[in-house]
Amino acid sequence: MTAFFLTIFIVIIVLVIIGLILFMLLEMKREKARLIKSLNMALFLVRLPKEDISGEERKQDKERIAVMEQLISSFATMHEGGWKGVVSGQPAVVLEMAVHHIGEEIHFYIAGPVRSAELIQRTVHGFYSAASVERVQDYNIFNPHGTHAGSVLTLAKRYFLPLRSYVTLESDPLNNISNALSKLEREGEGAAIQVVMQHAGNSWNKKAFAVARLMQRGKSYEAAVSEAAGGFLGFLKELSGGVGGEDKKKKEADEKAKTSLTPLAQETIKGIEGKASKAGFSVNVRLIASAPDALRAERILEQLENAFAQFSHPAWNGFKPRRVKGRALRNLLYNFSFRVFSEDEAMLLNTEEISSLYHFPISTLQTPRIGWLKAKTAPPPENLPEAEEGDGVTIGDSLFRGQARAVRMLREDRRRHLYVVGQTGTGKSTLLSEMIRQDIEKGEGVGIIDPHGDLAELALSLVPRERIKDVVYFNPGDMERPVGLNMLEAKGEDQRDFAVQEMIAIFMKLFPPEVVGPMFEHNMRNAMLTLMADPENPGTIVEIPRIFTDEAYVRSLLPKVQDPVVRAFWEKEMAKTSEFHKSEMLGYLVSKVGRFVENEMMRNIIGQPRSGFNIRDIMDNRKILIANLSKGKMGEVNSSLLGMILVSKLQMAAMARGDITQEGRADFYLYIDEFQNFTTDSIATILSEARKYRLNLIMAHQFIAQLPENIKNAAFGNVGSLCALRVGADDGEYLAKQFEPAFSQQDLLNLDNFNAVVKLMIRGQTSRPFNTLVHKPWERGVKPDLQAAQALKEFSRLTYGRAREVVQKEILERSQLARPVAAPSAMTPGESNK
């Protein structure tokens, strides 16, 4: 008998040891599985736009917070069944609100298993359609040289009793929580609130409803909890409700008890049933703070803990912070960093309670430093050209809900022109340079007019070495080898009339209207037409003063003049003009033309009878024209004059292509930065007509107020594609009408650098507006070839420029500038127009 009991004892001991070993192995396996699961979490940064909310809409705050409750409820479907669920635990969803140790914005994150990453992203977008849900690398709140503090929130009472929630609180509970996070220093201090959730199943609901039923029968809350949660037999007994004749007596007792319940008991029952009616989660709530010293870290943590006091209900439940130290703190920081769910920290909260302590910010939240989405995003059109489709350029990527698509403009659509607007430093030059690079590499004809010089210099460095001979670099600052540019160089009567009209328009734009009147226009028109009469030996602007002072020179030109009106101007009108009035006229003209004639740099460019390069040849043979018209080096008026002459000559060359078929007209892409400086009233004609002649414009500038009303109307009325980077308030108001309803004025004001809102012409149809991230060449391995750029400059100046001494001698001979002329009368500008 003794041997039998001894055997039984040994068997029990062995089974206990085996059980302990199996338990330890299971725990080790579970710990390993938890770690693997933690390392396989996808982290998303969630940002929402802060929209203007009216008074009526402010009343809907609770409805907005309820959206978060619905989102959390949807995660109840994430369940792991079978042995895998036992070993590795249920999948967790993690909600975090954090301020990094460098930076001051309050960021909102959501994390979940990598295998569910797409589901999480899609679900968040389903409830928050305007949100940006961006997968990101992990962040850091910890000061590497500082001290850390941490707390775990626990429930003050059993989970049956609910907390105060957003439904009963008067204001958004996130105000207090986020305010605590908004008081951190920009560097060296960080903090986070972490909510780790696992679905709790359904058994807790049954127990909670059982407690409510027992209280309805007159039992106190404590007695009801003790019986409902007092073990399996007690729970079955409560659920069975008795048998036989006892049912009727119990129902009568229940009815009697209901009538004797105190108001507090009735409210408690209602609260328990309300909590149990919603999905529940096992939750860890961790508060972490980091600062340069322990005192400051503890202070930050205390402010976070105090922010959760608002959820305490005097008769029901509340949070009880448990601050940890030493080894327990190290374990807490480990669990926080790896987002590990801990049974020891778990408490049961329903979706209403969780969404009260954590929800994405709503627009009425007044806390500063919230990491709002600066501008909304919109999906790209379905008919965006694919990478292999057609012949075009890529301007960036459309990033929408984690999906990236290249944004391309096809050749045919580019013929309807592109308008780009954005403040300085927002990425305009980057966009232009990337498009220029692609055009040059594809062998396209390209023109660049740059009033700053940086884009021109960059474009030079992007030219492949095999295209060096295609480049014409027009740099007025190179005074040793000036390149000629003569506006009075024209073929045929139509071109002469156009050139004169443009030159008049240029002067009217460069000078105030009160000093450029009808007499100035009349005299200048006849003078220029006379100088242009001999196409083999055209005159220049520099010779205009001479034509009014040298009668012999006029007589030498008149035989070439075929226009009877122009001849009559000299033979009749000027012949009858007194010397005094001629002198007065000369003074008036010199006051306008003289500023260019007297400037050596300008004189050596516009005084050459033959332009140093043939623009028609550049366009037809797909060459590259780069004009560096740096205002800082040559002055704004000089830069504008040369730029407008270039644009006018390009327009003349384009129109002259009417002598060849459309199929034979090579596309020429003209990039004009600060285009308002280089356009006259004829811009409307260029935009509407140049498409036929394959002159395709890409126009950029900083703000719409720079544009005269007629040019603004011409641009917005004729341009096929619009691209707006960040703009100011006035421009935002104007452009919002172009991009509604997808984007508002606020969106356009808050775009990050290199982000743009575009409305493209796609296969002849205008797309709906969408957002684009501009490609950054330096991130795509594009390296400027500075050595080649220098070689290009040298090749171009030797090919198209002429020696300074030769040019000066020629101009002096033609213009007779060294010859004394009658002194201009001392008169006020515009006096001759009276």
Regions found by a protein language model. Give the residues of each.
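Acidic, low-complexity intrinsically disordered tails
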Residues: D785, A789-K834
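Flexible glycine-/small-residue-rich
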Residues: R47-K50, V114, V195-H199, V283, ...
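Composition- and surface-driven signal marking solvent-exposed, interaction-prone regions
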Residues: T123, F209, A297-N306, W316-R322, ...
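Charge-patterned, long linear interaction tracts outside catalytic cores
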Residues: G188-V225, V516-E521, R525-K560, R768-A791
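Conserved ATP-driven motor cores of ASCE-family P-loop NTPases powering translocation/secretion/packaging/pilus
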Residues: A307, F311-P314, L348-L349, V463, ...
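Extended, folded cores of ATP/NTP-driven motor/assembly subunits in large transport
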Residues: T2-L384, M479-P482, P559-V561, Y588
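N-terminal pre-Walker A segment at the start of P-loop NTPase domains
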Residues: A387-A406
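P-loop NTPase motor domains
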Residues: D397-Q403, R411-D413, L418, Q423-T424, ...
